[in-house]
Structures are given as structure tokens and as C-alpha cells.
Amino acid sequence: MIDTFHYPNRMGRIILLSMEEVMGRNGVNAVLNLSSHKTLIENYPADDSKLNFPFSTVSALGGTLEQVYGPHGGRGLATRIGRACFNYGVRQYSGQMGLT
């Protein structure tokens, strides 16, 4: 039996919102469409702690970025998206993490 691991929905939401900030809504929709995650188009996960966002989805999104934009472009976009994720997470949840 293969175990599947999941991120909290909140993390999946942060990743998708950060992608939208960097690539725009149409760019995110195109990546979601190409990675066979059409159910997430205009339907981001809830802002809660439930573990329902699979690691495999995050992996597929990264792979699709590289497929569409090439190795260098995909890596550059992934870096910018990662920075946006960090900034978004700190901005939204600094109080919960004890940051001021």
C-alpha cells in the first residue's frame, strides 16, 4: 500500500495565490489545466488546517512549470513563487507564528 502525504489546505492555497501573484490568473489556470488539476481552477483550497492538498499536486505543478517554461525559466518562476509564498505566509500568519 502506498501512503499519500498531504499539505494543509492553507499551504496549498498560499502556493496557488503566490503563483497567481507571479504569473497572473491566466498563467495559473494554464498550468493547472496542463497538470490535469482542472478542479483547482477558480476553486482554490479552503483557508484551513485540514490535510487535503496532496504532495503530488505540488510536484505536478513544479513539473508543469518546467515543461512549459523550460528548465531555466521554470526554475526562475519557481524561485519567485517560493519567495512570494514566504512573503504571503509571513504577512498573513506572522501573529500565529509569534513574529512581529
Regions found by a protein language model. Give the residues of each.
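N-terminal interaction modules that seed assembly of large macromolecular complexes
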Residues: 26-64
